[in-house]
């Protein structure tokens, strides 16, 4: 009891309403909840905790593995006698869908999207509310996005992301995006929220796709990586059907939330059987702004990767980024996604994708070299990740080099060994060199 040594300070603290009380007061004040509903929610939550405690005691659990939700349905001894009389194990305890140990995707689902959905998203960017006047540059951007959706222009990184969000929303999957300057994006490529040039009012095109679409939230967060990532991790657990995304202003800044990453993102499943599909977008690239604005510290996340605890990706094309986001929304079992996103590629014409890559195909963990016409003539294979590919390809073209193939490793963990082996097998006469980012 700290009041024994600091009575005055803790007397003051005791008079301050708790965080929960302040939060409830805010919800009630905004009309989002009544006081009775708040009390009922608290009572239900506490009752659930009590039930789980009694269930654990009755089962005689003594280790994390014994109380892991993923193992309970496979071990009748742990559930026998826990529920009410006459109930079977399946009736007495229902595992939340978000914590199911199954693998794979939703049956019949693919990450490709129909062209008509893409066109709808494009049109939504040019149908402004009456009297709404966007900045002239943003009007031009929205018109380009419509042309991209119609297949008349290659699709860039910013619009590929909005296409992923929009198609998910139309399918009924909510999307939450938070971070510093995420509405516009640090590198000014997203513009998920548009502003009237005269009065500043906001318009979010992805909220006006269909009448019954899911919820799309975009929040410019406070400058606290620790607090915001912790909140979003919890949000991903409480709203598992939502694609919850946290974006660092620069990937380097995630070190301010390292405790959350260590204690929850990379290890909660192993410790508590707690599954999350949280997405961390970490801008990475040495074309940044010097120290602490260049490296998302890829090596740090690879050191934390083990026992299939995360999905670590560095996509190099808008289309693969699109498929990555849509795959994450439905991938089972749920795993956190660490995605290293580019800077230069956001506006690099060579990195744009054709609309056909969005209406067909899937996420590619490895991208082979489609420019090679004679694999037997290749004497060297360069294996790389991310934007580095475009630098290498440009230099190869400058030299007129036809003996070097470049393979992109898009998925860093789990390492796609079979796909890497298949890509390398095409070049039996070549040595392999890893090109470090």
Regions found by a protein language model. Name each.
Residues 1-436:
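Flexible, glycine-rich loop/tail regions that form catalytic "lids" or insertion modules at the edges
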